[in-house]
Amino acid sequence: LMAGNFPYNVYNNIIVNNISTHEGGGVSLNDAPNVRFFNNTVMKNITTATAMTSMGQPAPAGLSTSRNSNLLQATLPGTSPIFSDPLLFNNIFWDNRAGTFVGSTVAGIGLTGDPNPVNQWDLGVSDGIGLLSPTNSMMQVTTGTVASPTNIVGVNPNVVATYDTSVRALP
């Protein structure tokens, strides 16, 4: 989503079983400084770190944001964050997996034969320049976020049924 400096509401969505070769398997915000993201379920999204721009390193898999462009940042008040920092509340983030590209495969997303643990990364800023501040939300992990006592962390939301996306890395 590249919304410019306009208000944008993202709400009441089920964003599940998506794959990105870079970041934000579920949602990726770029140049969107005025976003309210609420009442959404973001589950079972995967990032593979296989894009030319990812350098093989894991990135947030559920919701990812990044540095604002210089052109957009120049239009914002001086006290504005330098990344798209959405208002996040009343969301469920669960089982979003951030892979690492190693050789000819992806580690950390649960592929058959991968000895590495699954790397859960629900939300964050892809280039590490800030932290997101979700509130009143369920999350599997807090990586990339500011802790809030209003969040429920590590408690399975026990959805009625799940589906695991089948992923294969071809040589």
Which residue stretches match the model-derived regions?
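Predominantly extracellular beta-rich ligand-binding scaffolds that present long acidic/polar faces
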Residues: 7-171
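Active-site core of PLP-dependent enzymes with the aminotransferase class I/II
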Residues: 4
